UniProtKB/Swiss-Prot annotation:
This is Crossover junction endodeoxyribonuclease RuvC. It catalyses: Endonucleolytic cleavage at a junction such as a reciprocal single-stranded crossover between two homologous DNA duplexes (Holliday junction). The lineage of its organism: Bacteria, Pseudomonadati, Pseudomonadota, Gammaproteobacteria, Pasteurellales. Binds 2 Mg(2+) ion per subunit. Its EC number is 3.1.21.10. NCBIfam families: ruvC. GO terms for molecular function: crossover junction DNA endonuclease activity; DNA binding; magnesium ion binding. Belongs to the RuvC family.
Length: 199
């Protein structure tokens, strides 16, 4: 029964690569072990004042959620930047995107950039071109997505792989005394908002 559940599991995942001027987004559908590309692009905020940029990011993310109705929201974690001002603006853009997701009752998951690269390319130090190439292969795309969109899709793919791993752990734990704890953890992690995980 657990193996059947893994194969029938389905969710739409929205990945976000935050930026104060360009915020990439990517949407995939996970059905069991299969990933399907639904859409991607970038929210561009070519204005000077930060408050207006944040407003546009919020509106853009909200519009994407309304259009694609994802079950989960995955976003890149803040990383240390050499320029403190740039890091601050990135953090504000990231926070704005998260608020947009939370206001739509989406569960939010965060991933370090190095983990995303490692998951998609096999190397935590991969460059943007390598990420683009692997995202194109994994999702069987005819054309490479733009860099920011590819990064967002990579984040969504990383979350899909995390779900798959969690379900495999639950499967192996079924016949053990840890099964109840494992399934409770999965419900806690994946059963917020509109999405429901049935085990």
């Amino acid at each position: 029964m657990f193996a059947l559940f893994i194969w029938s599991f389905m969710a739409i995942i929205l990945g976000i690569d935050p930026g104060s001027r360009v915020t990439g987004y990517g949407i995939i559908r996970q059905t069991g072990r299969t990933l399907e590309y639904l859409g991607s692009g970038a929210i561009r905020t070519q204005v000077e004042d930060l408050p207006t940029r944040l407003k546009r990011i919020y509106a853009g993310v909200t519009e994407i959620i309304t259009q694609f109705r994802p079950d989960m929201f995955a976003i890149e974690e803040v990383f240390l930047a050499k320029n403190p001002n740039s890091a601050l603006k990135l953090g504000q853009a990231r926070g704005t995107a998260i608020v947009a997701a939370v206001n739509q009752n989406l569960p939010v998951f965060e991933y370090a950039a190095r983990l995303v690269k490692q998951t998609v390319t096999g190397s935590g130090s991969a460059d943007k071109v390598q990420v683009q190439d692997m995202v194109t292969r994994i999702l069987r795309l005819s054309d490479k997505p733009q860099a920011d969109a590819a990064d967002a899709l990579a984040i969504a793919i990383t979350h899909a792989h995390t779900i798959q791993h969690s379900l495999q752990v639950a499967t192996s734990a079924k016949s053990t005394e840890n099964h109840e704890k494992t399934t409770a953890l999965l419900r806690t992690r994946y059963s917020r908002g509109r999405f429901r995980l049935k085990i």
